[in-house]
A protein has these predicted regions:
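Mature, structured domains of secreted/extracytosolic soluble proteins
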Residues: 4-249
Length: 249
């Protein structure tokens, strides 16, 4: 359809750093012995297919030994994919050339600062080998793993704080929808579009109803939440004041 063609054109490879690049991001990554750990995790997450297609990407790939490969390899696949792999890949070309001061949205919708002039950093990490050209984008080798950075929405469910009661209550209103623009389209099967990588937008209907878009990282919020102990105490107090119908008890 026209819409699908437009979507493909939106991410068609263009403006490659050098016009002689003939191999894909995946081919270059998988052939680079200094990026073998990152390439192994990329393949595990299905990004060998994503980074082989003709849409344009920039990858900031951490060098071997600059991150904890074993921990990531043993992580739940969905978590590793979102917090690590999608955290190092962005749509479009972001070359390290001249003066750069950009806020880059990664595939997982985390924002990173890409800055420099002669020497460059991404998310505070040095680009040790910038501008490795590819037929479908640009590859930068970096010295370390980019920080994931939990937003408020994610922190509530991270189990790092005594907020289980609040988390369970909010979870009733958790929603997900497909981010068509950032998902990577695959072949059409039986007339239906398939995706090599489906990016899901997570949001909370309860918070959104209060116009508290706590999963939106282009805004800043402060949220004060009760601990489990405080939640249970106040809930019991309120429950004693209310006379519930039998069907709501």
């Amino acid at each position: 359809t026209t819409a699908c063609s437009d979507w493909d054109d939106h991410y068609d490879a263009n403006g490659i750093v050098t016009g002689s690049a003939t191999t894909t991001l995946w081919e270059n990554m998988s052939a680079n012995k200094n990026l073998s750990d990152f390439a192994a995790l990329a393949k595990k997450a299905g990004y060998d297919q994503v980074l082989s297609n003709p849409q344009t990407y920039t990858v900031w790939a951490p060098l071997n030994g600059s991150f904890d490969y074993e921990t990531l390899n043993n992580m739940d696949l969905a978590t590793m994919k979102k917090q690590f792999m999608q955290n190092h890949v962005a749509h479009f070309n972001y070359p390290a050339s001249g003066s750069v001061d950009k806020s880059v949205y990664m595939i997982n919708e985390k924002m990173k600062k890409f800055v420099g002039n002669g020497t460059y950093t991404m998310g505070g990490l040095e680009l040790v080998q910038p501008n490795i050209p590819n037929s479908n984008g640009t590859l930068h080798a970096i010295n370390g793993k980019l920080d994931f950075g939990f937003n408020i929405y994610e922190s509530i469910n991270a189990n790092d704080y005594p907020l289980d009661s609040v988390s369970a209550y909010f979870a009733k209103y958790d929603m997900k929808s497909l981010d068509v623009e950032n998902s990577v389209k695959g072949p059409v099967v039986d007339g239906q579009i398939t995706y090599l990588d489906s990016v899901l937008v997570e949001y909370n209907a309860l918070a959104n109803n209060m116009r508290a878009y706590i999963n939106n990282e282009d805004s800043n919020y402060t949220m004060i939440l009760p601990t489990n102990e405080a939640w249970i105490e106040k809930k019991q107090y309120v429950d004693a004041l209310l006379d519930y119908l039998p069907s709501y008890q």
